């Protein structure tokens, strides 16, 4: 598989606190992609997201093997998220100006014809199919809980006053629990990882249409960014697209 990514500060923020990376794994053709959306005063959100990305990747490279089973890969990803959490928390403890900083994380590690997906917070993973965009991850957020309890709709969640409140993040707590998913990909299916800066400005249907307008993966990402900016882009926008060559 191959991948490309895009990140932008948006139209209403002064600093981009999102970080993404794509690197090769241990197996032939294996890719690792990760997106983090940081939070914290001054530039601490950017520090949190970049620290988490680097720690997650470094730890994963140290344990990845080409012959890993899916279950072993799931365990490795969870372990590396805990290490990334410790790195962010340690920095906050050592630098008082960064107290309380944190970051979301969503990652994909390709594994043969599929991928192992992991998330903490409200950065998302989607499967881009032939007819629609299928959300893989569940947000760890206040509004997600309200949707699941039937108190609000998904459309209402996009403008809810508490839409930015997440219930899990790397950094604030000693221990973190991540959700891990196994995904099988068809020959024409792609994976989209993104920060909530994209999600709050467009519906899944609109995002699917924007991706479909691109003749290349890079153009698809440009269309997603353009869509977000047309809606005011109130937050940083980051997206990574993984696709078959």
Task: Pin down the residues of each PLM region.
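PP2C/PPM-type serine/threonine phosphatase catalytic domain
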Residues: 1-245
């Amino acid at each position: 598989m191959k991948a490309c990514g895009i990140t932008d500060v948006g139209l209403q923020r002064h600093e981009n606190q999102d970080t993404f990376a794509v690197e090769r794994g241990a197996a032939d053709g294996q890719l690792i992609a990760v997106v983090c959306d940081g939070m914290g005063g001054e530039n601490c959100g950017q520090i949190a997201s970049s620290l988490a990305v680097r720690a997650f990747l470094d730890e994963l490279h140290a344990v990845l093997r080409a012959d890993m089973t899916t279950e072993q890969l799931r365990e490795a990803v969870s372990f590396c998220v805990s290490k990334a959490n410790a790195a962010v928390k340690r920095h906050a403890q050592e630098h008082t100006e960064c107290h309380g900083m944190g970051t979301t994380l969503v990652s994909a590690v390709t594994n043969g014809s599929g991928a192992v997906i992991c998330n903490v917070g409200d950065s998302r993973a989607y499967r881009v199919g032939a007819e629609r965009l299928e959300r893989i991850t569940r947000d760890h957020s206040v509004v997600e809980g309200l949707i699941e309890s039937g108190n609000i709709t998904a459309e209402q969640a996009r403008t809810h006053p508490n839409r930015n409140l997440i219930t899990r993040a790397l950094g604030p707590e000693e221990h973190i629990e991540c959700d891990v998913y196994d995904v099988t990909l068809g020959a024409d299916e792609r994976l989209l990882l993104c920060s909530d800066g994209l999600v709050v400005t467009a519906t899944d249907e609109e995002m699917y249409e924007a991706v479909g307008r691109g003749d290349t993966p890079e153009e698809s990402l440009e269309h997603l960014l353009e869509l977000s900016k047309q809606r005011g882009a109130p937050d940083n926008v980051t997206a990574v697209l993984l696709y078959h060559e």
